[in-house]
Amino acid sequence: MKVRLKSIAILLVSISVFTGCFKWGSRAYDRFPETIALDKNYFYEGKVIIVGAGASGLAAARILERNNINYEILEATDRYGGRLQKDTLLADFPIDLGAEWIHNQPGILNKLIGLPGDWTSEELLPYSIDSVFSWDGIDYVQTEKEELDAFFNFFPEYKFKSSTWFDYVDDNFARHVKHKIRFNTPVSEIDYSSNKVILKTKDGVEHVADKVLVTVSIGVLKANVIKFNPELSNKKTRAINRVEFLPGFKLAMKFSEKFYPDAIIFDSDIGDHGYY
């Protein structure tokens, strides 16, 4: 298969964007194409530069690697994975510092790497009304339980048990392509006004490519960290601005003894606590 692309493409792909994750997750499996890029063969003789070594960039690089296409990855930081990070020092199990939820059935993990089957070899924890919630002093009536069962069936939720999203991406994508990553190379300008694309980094160094894949996060695009010449089309700009991106953070705390339930989801208006 020959690839005919414009000189620049922006991949708006994320493992876990906060907005609309339920709406997206519940339908993503059904909307997943029968064949994905990893299933196909590509031919391209030019050089491709991928901007960003997050999940999208690593997945794109894996496709190019498998098809022997000349490519390079420019990563702004000193690590790969983007918002996928893990901590192995705080506890005796890895802690996801970035994305951690799988808003879908386990088979989606196979589809992402081009494998058949509805179940994955990854060890996962399913979330259901029986395994997830308990309440202080309140028993579920049958109708409430049925409603919540239906909710979890429509919005399936899983988490990795003894690994993380970072491990999944590292094992299936990064280990094949990390030798092509230039770390600490933040791109500040992309000029695609001629046949060749010129990328300039913050230290003034220029990199030349025939095609460019921009895989930075939506937050970076919204902040206009990268200057494009010519400017992005109104269609692309509107698409970027329409994606809602809310701030958030994670706080992991370690105690000498357990004095609390497994976790607290929220406090309701009447003071009841939900645990998961």
Which residue ranges define each predicted feature?
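N-terminal secretory signal peptides that target proteins for export/translocation
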Residues: 1-3
